């Protein structure tokens, strides 16, 4: 059912590939509808983390309420714009933002056309039953080819795009057309204002004054200050303190009704209790069942984080707790390493998420940290029949106890200019990928589908892909189960001590090559000591590669001019004894660069 009020509301989001101008378009819409004056405008208004602006990416979902007056009849419409992240790692964030909308504006760059994430995000919008409104951006560029792109959208995605607005978000050209298209094409929300309350949390973050602020989309019912609410997945009850809308800053209102997008605060202390995707209902008149689609965020990549200065352990713990308040996808538990001391094992959504967390710890909390090599979750079937999951290579059981191991696989979709198909296929082959199929999108561009082990992707797949295709390829992936593989644990032994932080799990047939390169890399990086340091790579008890860092030595014979050979021999023997003793007590520091360079090797 639809009320008169709801007919004038449109809830929509903007989806696009990275750098196709999504956040810029959002800025222009805010400016055009007078939500922000020209003076308040800054680039990427909705990206309010410093890191987001710096990298030009959107990490957290944001929302803004625009008031649009149609020129022809003067009708006022409330347009709720929900800005979504565009990166693979934050797919779940995108899916919840989509669930809060009825329509999606699909931005396509007029010079580049459809890219892998354009497709991924567009299919996601269609799966959520949204009306997709294509918009072609950057038509002010000399290399723009809007007509070809329109055909491409129709052929590849199958959306009618003959009347797609041609805009330039940078100069503000034809922005009015986008607003008009949203009003005409995006369906108005429906929902029972009198029914039991049902609201979807599509984002939540911690404010030091208000506690957790939940960004919500109300599907049914009404919520106002004083309402007693229950979070269905967390199974906790609270009393609402304040409700309001975003203009992008907070504006307090009396109540929010079905169809509205806004925020509530209810002195919730922890972001974990207000999980994104959870359903809010009323305690006295609860909804029968929650809204569909909630799932806890799943960590795909694990890594150890250690403070460089071990006395900063408590500070690191506080930093992680504060970041976790705002990021329900981050999880961590304490762990110790012989080489690095006390630290934490953290789970991330993917590599970008991991990099961003490391940057935020270093910038916002002023802590220097070491990150160990990222690892995925392996499943190990032991000989006694038990199945365990391994996130840290050091916890892998002895080879004699393992029946078989499985590693996660992803389905990768790569779109590349046809000149580079050979190079891309070679890369996927090198990364143990299996070919699924390929199809031509247009004469010059090809879409390749591969199954690739996740372990191969988390190191440097994206960088290699970009460098092999001169930066033209785009890439998207989704988890596709597990597959059985012959895997072994590769240990690095320095001065006859295993450095647990450098251990990694590798395919059996690649262990030798990997061990060789790691030993060579470490030889270059580890500073010379006064005694020689053997660097060994081992699988189980078998040494597969060895390099030696030569000792620095003092010339003890300098003071002997001529003289007896036995005198010289005595001095050399004495030096040798000293070196031997030093080697037994000396310890070797592994510099931070060692960890980084080992991740980056091909």
From Swiss-Prot:
GO (cellular component) term, any one: plasma membrane
GO molecular function, one term: translation elongation factor activity
Record keywords: Cell membrane, GTP-binding, Hydrolase, Membrane, Nucleotide-binding, Protein biosynthesis
Binding site for GTP: 19-24, 137-140
Gene3D superfamilies referenced in this protein's UniProt entry, alphabetically: 3.30.70.240, Elongation factor 4, C-terminal domain (3.30.70.2570), Elongation Factor G (Translational Gtpase), domain 3 (3.30.70.870), P-loop containing nucleotide triphosphate hydrolases (3.40.50.300), Translation factors (2.40.30.10)
Location(s), subcellular: Cell membrane
PANTHER family, alphabetized: TRANSLATION FACTOR GUF1 HOMOLOG, CHLOROPLASTIC, TRANSLATION FACTOR GUF1-RELATED
Protein name: Elongation factor 4
Superkingdom classification of source: Bacteria
Reactions this protein catalyses: GTP + H2O = GDP + phosphate + H(+)
């Amino acid at each position: 059912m639809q009320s008169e009020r709801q007919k004038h509301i449109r809830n929509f989001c903007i989806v696009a590939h990275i750098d196709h101008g999504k956040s810029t378009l959002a800025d222009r819409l805010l400016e055009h509808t007078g939500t922000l004056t020209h003076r308040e405008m800054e680039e990427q208004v909705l990206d309010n983390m410093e890191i987001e602006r710096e990298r030009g990416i959107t990490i957290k979902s944001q929302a803004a309420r625009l008031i649009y007056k149609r020129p022809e009849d003067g009708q006022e419409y409330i347009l709720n714009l929900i800005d979504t992240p565009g990166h693979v790692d934050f797919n779940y964030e995108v899916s919840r933002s989509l669930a809060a909308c009825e329509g999606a504006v699909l931005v396509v760059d007029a010079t580049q056309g459809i890219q892998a994430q354009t497709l991924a995000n567009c299919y996601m919008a269609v799966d959520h039953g949204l009306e997709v409104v294509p918009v072609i951006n950057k038509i002010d560029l000399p290399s723009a080819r809007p007509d070809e792109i329109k055909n491409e959208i129709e052929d590849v995605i199958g959306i009618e795009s003959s009347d797609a607005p041609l805009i330039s978000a940078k100069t503000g050209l034809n922005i009015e057309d986008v607003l008009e298209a949203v009003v005409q094409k995006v369906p108005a929300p429906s929902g029972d204002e009198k029914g039991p309350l049902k609201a979807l949390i599509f984002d939540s973050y911690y404010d030091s004054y208000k506690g957790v602020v939940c960004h919500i989309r109300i599907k049914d019912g009404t919520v106002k200050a004083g309402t007693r609410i229950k979070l269905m997945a967390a199974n906790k009850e609270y009393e609402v303190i304040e409700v309001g809308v975003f203009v992008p800053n907070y504006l307090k209102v009396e109540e929010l009704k079905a169809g509205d997008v806004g925020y509530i605060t209810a002195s919730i202390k922890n972001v974990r209790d207000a999980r994104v995707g959870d359903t809010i209902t009323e305690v006295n008149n609860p909804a029968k069942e929650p809204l569909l689609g909630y799932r806890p965020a799943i960590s795909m990549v694990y890594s150890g984080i250690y403070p460089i200065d071990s006395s900063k352990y408590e500070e690191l713990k506080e930093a992680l707790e504060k970041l976790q308040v705002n990021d329900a996808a981050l999880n961590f538990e304490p762990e110790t390493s012989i080489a690095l001391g006390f630290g934490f094992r953290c789970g991330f959504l993917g590599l970008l998420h991991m990099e961003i967390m490391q940057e935020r710890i270093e910038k916002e909390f002023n802590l220097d940290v070491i990150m160990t090599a990222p690892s995925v979750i392996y499943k190990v079937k032991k000989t006694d029949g038990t199945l365990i999951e391994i996130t840290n290579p050091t916890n892998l059981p002895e080879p004699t106890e393992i029946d078989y191991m499985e590693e996660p696989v992803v389905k990768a979709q790569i779109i590349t200019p046809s000149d580079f198909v050979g190079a891309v296929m070679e890369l996927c082959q090198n990364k143990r990928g299996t070919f699924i199929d390929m199809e031509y999108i247009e004469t010059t561009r090809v879409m390749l589908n591969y199954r690739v082990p996740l372990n191969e992707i988390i190191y440097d797949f994206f960088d290699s892909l970009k460098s092999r295709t001169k930066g033209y390829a785009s890439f998207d992936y989704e988890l596709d189960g597990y597959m059985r593989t012959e895997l072994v644990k590769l240990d690095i032994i320095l001065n006859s001590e295993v450095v647990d932080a450098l251990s990694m799990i590798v395919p059996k047939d690649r262990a030798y090559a990997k061990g060789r390169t790691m030993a060579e890399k470490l030889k270059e990086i580890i500073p010379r000591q006064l005694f020689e340091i053997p660097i060994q790579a081992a699988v189980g008890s078998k040494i597969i590669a060895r390099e030696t860092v030569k000792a620095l030595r003092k010339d003890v014979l300098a003071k002997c001019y001529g003289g007896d050979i036995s005198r010289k021999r005595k001095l050399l023997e004495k030096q040798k004894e000293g070196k031997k003793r030093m080697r037994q007590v000396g310890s070797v520091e592994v510099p931070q660069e060692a960890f980084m360079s080992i991740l980056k090797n091909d």
